């Protein structure tokens, strides 16, 4: 049930549900993407007279190599490569959960946020409804399951 924003990891989780309900066209869903924020305080520490060092053994030469590439060479590519792998895993899960083919050009898989009406029209959310509607649906599913168990269906 969506009563506000169902974005990113929340969208991933929500699409795994048996049915999704959204309260209003004003609600938002989507944001299938991944990002990383990088900050270095080394220059600040240096200006404060603090000698900040990261020391690695030769046997752990790949430890934190992505951030070290940024610090030493201003090279974001190693991090972008890892993020691309994680993004594809995210997209594949959404694709599987929604039953739609992965298309890297589709705005859904490029991080766009959609209003409730667009999300329902595109099949990203099953239907508009209230929390009560969602609870009734869950109870109905439980009843059907119980009847099926009773009659070995």
Question: Predicted segment positions?
Answer:
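N-terminal organellar transit peptides
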Residues: 1-27, 32-153
């Amino acid at each position: 049930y969506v009563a506000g924003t169902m974005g990113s990891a929340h969208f991933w989780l929500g699409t795994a549900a048996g049915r999704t309900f959204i309260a209003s066209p004003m609600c938002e869903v989507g944001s299938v993407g991944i990002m990383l924020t990088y900050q270095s305080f080394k220059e600040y520490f240096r200006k404060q007279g603090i000698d900040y060092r990261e020391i690695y053994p030769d046997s752990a030469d790949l430890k934190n190599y992505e951030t070290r590439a940024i610090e030493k060479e201003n090279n974001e590519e190693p991090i972008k490569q890892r993020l691309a792998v994680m993004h594809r895993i995210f997209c594949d899960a959404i694709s599987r959960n929604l039953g739609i083919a992965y298309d890297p050009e589709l705005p859904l898989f490029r991080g766009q946020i959609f209003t409730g009406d667009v999300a329902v029209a595109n099949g990203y959310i099953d239907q508009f409804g209230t929390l009560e509607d969602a609870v009734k649906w869950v109870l109905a599913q439980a009843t059907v399951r119980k009847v099926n168990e009773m009659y070995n269906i």
